[in-house]
Amino acid sequence: MCPLRNLLLVATLVLLNHLDHLSLGRSLPATTAGPGMFKCLNHSQNLLKAVSNTLQKAKQTLEFYSCTSEEIDHEDITKDKTSTVEACLPLELATNESCLAARETSLITNGNCLTSGKTSFMTTLCLSSIYEDLKMYHVEFQAMNAKLLMDPKRQIFLDQNMLTAITELMQALNFNSETVPQKPSLEELDFYKTKIKLCILLHAFRIRAVTIDRMMSYLNSS
């Protein structure tokens, strides 16, 4: 093949590759970060810090309760109730929005994390799922703290900073969903079991807080 044909072939391939990227770019939902998203990023960072501090304190205080990540039985209270991990995939990896949409209830979105008129469906779905996660954990932690306050040993309580951080991020998201409010699990008042359950929940919630913080960082940089 002559040099001219080689040059034309390379130029054609480069052009086709460029057009393919442009087509892909047009097919992706647009997400524009605004001041509200930056505020939510700050709240998610505060939440991750508060959860990490609370978990560290629990591991130190409950050192004889098998409270390390290697010792506990991992449990996700949001399993089969929310789809945060799937809904919060980066937009370029989310290939089937309709499958995710089918798993959600209708939503009324008033959150200041959203940029009016510029937020994709996938972003809204992700943030609403995060809100539902926070709501479930908040209910569980409040019920658990009520039990811990009845413990004669007064050994450990939940850090108010963590509960406040959850509330602040929920307020920033400000989703009003039609889902039925979650009820805390009703168990026998066994303080040993409650403390073990606290460790399990804190480990699970910290993992979820990492996911939330990473997603807020991603949306803020979009």
UniProtKB/Swiss-Prot annotation:
Superkingdom of this protein's organism: Eukaryota
Gene3D superfamilies linked: 1.20.1250.10
Biological process terms in GO annotation: immune response; interleukin-12-mediated signaling pathway
Keyword Transferase: no
Localization annotation: Secreted
Pfam families: IL12 (PF03039)
UniProt signal peptide: 1-25
InterPro entries: 4_helix_cytokine-like_core, IL-12, IL-12_alpha
UniProt-recorded Gene Ontology molecular function terms: cytokine activity; growth factor activity; interleukin-12 receptor binding
Sugar attachment sites: 42, 96
Any one Gene Ontology cellular component term annotated for this protein: interleukin-12 complex
Chief location category: secreted
UniProt keyword list: Cytokine, Disulfide bond, Glycoprotein, Growth factor, Secreted, Signal
Keyword Disulfide bond among record annotations: yes
Coiled coil location: none
Disulfide bonds: 40-113, 67-199, 88-126
Subunit text: Heterodimer with IL12B; disulfide-linked. This heterodimer is known as interleukin IL-12. Heterodimer with EBI3/IL27B; not disulfide-linked. This heterodimer is known as interleukin IL-35. Interacts with NBR1; this interaction promotes IL-12 secretion.
Protein function: Heterodimerizes with IL12B to form the IL-12 cytokine or with EBI3/IL27B to form the IL-35 cytokine. IL-12 is primarily produced by professional antigen-presenting cells (APCs) such as B-cells and dendritic cells (DCs) as well as macrophages and granulocytes and regulates T-cell and natural killer-cell responses, induces the production of interferon-gamma (IFN-gamma), favors the differentiation of T-helper 1 (Th1) cells and is an important link between innate resistance and adaptive immunity.
Family designation: Belongs to the IL-6 superfamily.
Record's protein name: Interleukin-12 subunit alpha
